Every structure is written in C-alpha cells, then in structure tokens.
C-alpha cells in the first residue's frame, strides 16, 4: 500500500472574480522508503503541491482532488483539526532559506527543544527530567553537528547557512516523520554544502526508512539522489520516470530541454556560444495557451498540439506529449 496517493490534484487561486488554476490534475504515488523528486521552473507549482499535502492553504485557495490518501486515510474527509494532528505526527517539511525560518531572538537549542513533541518520549517516567535536551543533542549529532554545545547556545545569525539547514532538518526529524518534504533545501548554498545536506537526507532515508519528497529546479541534482522524478511545467505533470531512465531517455521535449540546459564542463565551448535553452518564457497563469502549455515554446510543436495531451506510456514511464521523443530506442 502506498504511503501517499494523490490523484488529479487541482489548486486554484481566486484573483478578483475569477479562479485561476495554478496546479492542474497532478497525480503522484509515493511508497514507503522512497525518495521522489519534483522538478520544474519557478512558478510551476512545486511548493503549492507540498503545501496542499500539509494542508497549509490560504483563504483564496481552492484545493480539489479525486483522491488524496495518506496511509489509507482520506485527507479530504478530515476536519482541519484532524488534518493538523495527522500531519503533525507523520509529516515534516524543510523550507528554503533556513535562517529566515528560525527565530532570530531565540537560541538554537531552545528552539529545537520547543519543537520536540511530548509524545515522542519512550522512556520511564522517572527519566523524563532533561529528556528534551538529551533528545536535542541526539538530533544535532544525527544531522552531522558534532559541537552541539556551541550550536545550542548560538543564535541563528551566528551559524552558517548550511548549519542552519542542518538545524532545520533536526527540527523536522523531532516528530519522527514518515514523510519528509524538502522544498529546495539547498537553494543558494555552496556545492560542498549541498552535497552534505543531500548525503544527510539519503542517510536518513536508508537508516529510518523515511519517505522523502525532494523539490528542486535542478534536474541534475535530483537525478543523483531521487529514485523517481516527476517533471512539472505550468502546473501540469509532463513526464514521470525513474531517475536514470528519465535522464538517458526523455520522452517529453521539456525534459529534454532541462537536460540540455545542464552545462557540460567536460568539453570546450566556443567563445560567446549560446546556451541550450527553450525560446520564450513560462506563460502567466492568466494567459495560458490552448492545448499543450509548452506548445508556443516547443521546437516539435504541430497542429495536433492545440489539443491537451493526456499522460500516457508504460507504468514506470509516463509522458504527456503527442509526439514523444526517443521512442525508437524502446
């Protein structure tokens, strides 16, 4: 049984008197212990999907789905209070810009201890004294912070961005989640720090069997760490496949464009040569094209593309394109 099963998730915003679809019929199934990647440009709806899973909705949002189940529990039928309780016990989220997510006026140790739920205590009643501090030290060691004394008495601005993100991961692990959502956890970090964070998440997945949803705009990075990747464009899923298969044999032109945009430092490039990017820009939600949303930018677009393509293909490799690429190799 899948841990998270989403079918035809749609998220709409109310702008004035009209509703605008920001996410359109996105489906996703995550199994226990899986690392799933979610990739797309800024504005493709990646963070909105994560917030919809956690139930963090605004008043001008309308979230609908044919199915949204977490471990055989229908999230759509739960009240707001029941949803918060379920998510608080089973789901954690890591946000972008960790320093802005921490309270600048509180020491890191106090913030970490405040986020350790009482129900996670498993010892005897006479051992409860100081257990949150011991648990906080254990979590800091678990995420790779060896000098816990210095980290716990520091304020967030006294730590590096990488250390703050490790603290945020420790806070996310405090409730022992079954699903960890990482929304661009290494955005604007140095490559060495990025590798440390992703190695840490992979180790947590292997040791605790924690399911991880990795959200990023970097396809090259996701292909190294995720088991399977969903590619989003303008709020729609355009391709889903195992990581290696997606990178070596993409079927959708947008996926191919993301792969070609990855710089190749192994070969020399002519001076002032153009990068392999798609022409144009991602359309506004209020001005979406008819049919395939990539149509105006797609180099392979034809007359049939005015009809919205359905997600089709094999069980492990789905694509939404009338003229898929690399089909002769299968």
Curated annotation (Swiss-Prot):
Binding site for ATP: 40-47
CC terms in the record's Gene Ontology section: ATP-binding cassette (ABC) transporter complex, substrate-binding subunit-containing; membrane
Record keyword NADP present: no
Outcome of swapping residue 162 to A: 80% stimulation of K(+) uptake by TrkH
Compartment(s) of residence: Cell inner membrane
Keywords: ATP-binding, Cell inner membrane, Cell membrane, Ion transport, Membrane, Nucleotide-binding, Potassium, Potassium transport, Transport
ABC transporter domain boundaries: 6-259
GO molecular function, one term: putrescine transmembrane transporter activity
PANTHER family: OLIGOPEPTIDE TRANSPORT ATP-BINDING PROTEIN APPD, PUTRESCINE EXPORT SYSTEM ATP-BINDING PROTEIN SAPD
Family classification: Belongs to the ABC transporter superfamily.
Function: Part of a putrescine export transport system, does not play a role in resistance to antimicrobial peptides. Stimulates K(+)-uptake proteins TrkG and TrkH to import K(+), may act via ATP-binding rather than ATP hydrolysis.
Protein name (Swiss-Prot/TrEMBL): Putrescine export system ATP-binding protein SapD
UniProt source species: Escherichia coli (strain K12)
Organism ancestry: Bacteria, Pseudomonadati, Pseudomonadota, Gammaproteobacteria, Enterobacterales
């Amino acid at each position: 049984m899948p841990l998270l099963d989403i079918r035809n998730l749609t998220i709409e915003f109310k702008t004035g008197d009209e509703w605008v679809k920001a996410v359109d019929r996105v489906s996703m199934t995550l199994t226990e212990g899986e690392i799933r990647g979610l990739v797309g440009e800024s504005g493709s709806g990646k963070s909105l999907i994560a917030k919809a899973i956690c139930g963090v909705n605004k008043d001008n949002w309308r979230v609908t789905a044919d199915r949204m189940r977490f471990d055989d529990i229908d999230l759509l039928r739960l009240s707001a209070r029941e949803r918060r309780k379920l998510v608080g016990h089973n789901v954690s989220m890591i946000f972008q810009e960790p320093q802005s997510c921490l309270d600048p006026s509180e020491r890191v140790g106090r913030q970490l201890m405040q986020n350790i739920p009482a129900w996670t205590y498993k010892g005897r009643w006479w051992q409860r004294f100081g257990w949150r501090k011991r648990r906080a030290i254990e979590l800091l060691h678990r995420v790779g912070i060896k000098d816990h004394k210095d980290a716990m008495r520091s304020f967030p601005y006294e730590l590096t961005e990488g250390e703050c993100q490790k603290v945020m991961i420790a806070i996310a692990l405090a409730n022992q989640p079954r699903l960890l959502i990482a929304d661009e956890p290494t955005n604007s970090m140095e490559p060495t720090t990025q590798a440390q964070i992703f190695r840490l998440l992979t180790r947590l997945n292997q040791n605790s069997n924690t399911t991880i949803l990795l959200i990023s705009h970097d396809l090259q990075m996701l292909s190294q760490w995720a088991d399977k990747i969903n590619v989003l464009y303008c709020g729609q899923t355009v391709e889903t496949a195992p990581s290696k298969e997606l990178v070596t044999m993409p079927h959708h032109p947008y996926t191919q464009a993301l792969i070609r945009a990855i710089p190749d430092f192994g070969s020399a490039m002519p001076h002032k040569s153009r990068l392999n990017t798609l022409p144009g820009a991602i359309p506004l939600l209020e001005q979406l094209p008819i049919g395939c949303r990539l149509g105006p930018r797609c180099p392979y677009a034809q007359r049939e593309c005015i009809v919205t393509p359905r997600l089709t293909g094999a069980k492990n490799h789905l694509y939404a394109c009338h003229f898929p690429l690399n089909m002769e190799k299968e």
